[in-house]
Amino acid sequence: MTYSIFDREQLVIGGLNERKNKVIFERDMVSLLQKPHAFSQEGTHLIERTVERIRVAKEKKSSVMLTFGAHTIKNCMAPVLIALMKEGWVTHLATNGAGIIHDWEIAFQGQTSEDVRANVERGQFGIWEEPGFYINLAIIVGAYENLGYGESVGKMIANEGLKIPEISTLYDTTTQYMESDPDKAAAAIDLAGTIKRFGLKAGWMPIPHPYKKYSVQYQAYESDIPFTGHPMFGHDIIYTHPMNHGAAIGRTALNDFLRYAASVVNLEDGVYMSVGSAVMSPMIFEKSLSMAQNLKIKEGKHIDNHYILIVDLAESDWDWQQNGEPPMDHPAYYLRYCKTFHRMGGEIHYLSADNRDFLLALYRQLKGEK
C-alpha cells in the first residue's frame, strides 16, 4: 500500500528571535536560598525519610537517581538540580525529550516555553530554526561519536559548537567499518548524508551558548555525571525540522537507556526519585529493573532494598506502602506511575507536591537546613 509522507522541507520555519517566551530564566529562576512552602506532617516525614535514605546510599556508593519531566526545567529548577549533582547527592539525572530541549533553549537564549495555543493556531508551534537545526545536528554528530542523547547536547553546549568532519573521512569510515562495525559505518554515512544535504562546511561550527551556566546538561557533562535523555518519536518540537534524523535519535537514545539501566543495576540500598513524569520514568524503570534483576540473579543476588519516591501534583489518598495495589474499581488504580512503581518491590512512597517545593525542601534538609 502507498501512504502519504509529510514533507518537512515545505515548512516555513521561523527564527527564535520571532518567538515570545513565557519563561525568562534570570527573572524566574528558583534560588537555593528560597524557602519551600510548608508540607503536611506526612509530607515532612517523607522528605526526612528520603534524606535519610540518600545519606545511606551515598555512604554505600549506591545509585541515587532523579528522573523528572520537562516542567522541572521549565520551572527554572536548574540551580537546585545542579547543586544536588555537584554536591554529590545525586548520581544520575534523567529527563524526557522536552526536558532536553527546554534546558538547551535556556543555555542558548536564556528563555523558553512558547505559547502553544497561539502558535498552533498560526501554524508555528515548534517550527523554529535554531532548536530544530542545532539539537538535531548535535544528535547526528553524537551518534557518529557513539554518545548518548543528553551527552550529545551537553557536549555541544559545553564546547559552544560542533566539529563537522570532512565528508571524505566519513566515506572512508563507512567503507572501513562496513563489515566489522556496521553501526559505526551507518552512523558515519548518516552524518555524511546530513552534511551533503544541508551543505555544511567541514571544520568547527561555532554555536554560542551565553547562558550555559544555567544548563543542567552542561553542568552534568562538565562534572562527568550521567544526564540521560529519553525521547519518544514525534513528542518534541525538533521533529518538525528537516534536520531531524530518526536513526541518530535511536542510536543516542538507546545509549542513554542502557546507561540509565546500568545505574539501576547499582540500586540496591539506593534511591530512585520520580518527579513529575507520568509515563517516561515508570516505563523505562520497569524494563531496566527487570534487566538488572536478571543480571543479579545470575550472580546469586537480588535488588530488594531500594527506595522509590514518586512526586507529582495529583492528589492520592491511597497508601501504596501499607495497602498495596488498589482494586480496579478504585481511581488510584489508574495512577499509572504509582501502580507501575509499586510493582517494582522495595520501599515506595507517593508525595503530592509541586516539584519546586519538593526539590527545595530536599536540598535544604540534605544541607542540614529547615
Residue ranges and their predicted role:
Residues 2-82, 90:
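N-terminal glycine-/serine-/threonine-rich phosphate-binding loop
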Residues 43-48, 208-209, 231, 246-265:
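A general structural motif
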Residues 48-63, 219-223, 262-269, 370:
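Glycine-rich phosphate/diphosphate-binding loops that line cofactor/substrate pockets in enzymes
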Residues 62-71, 93-95, 271-278:
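Short glycine-rich or small-residue beta-strand-to-loop segments that form or flank ligand, phosphate
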Residues 75-77, 82, 86-138, 211:
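Active-site histidine-anchored catalytic micro-motif
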Residues 98-103, 235-238, 281, 315-317:
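Short gly/pro/ser/thr-enriched loop/turn and capping motifs at secondary-structure boundaries
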Residues 115-223, 228-229:
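Ligand-binding beta-strand-loop-alpha-helix segment within the catalytic cores
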Residues 250, 259-263, 269-271, 278-370:
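C-terminal functional extensions of proteins
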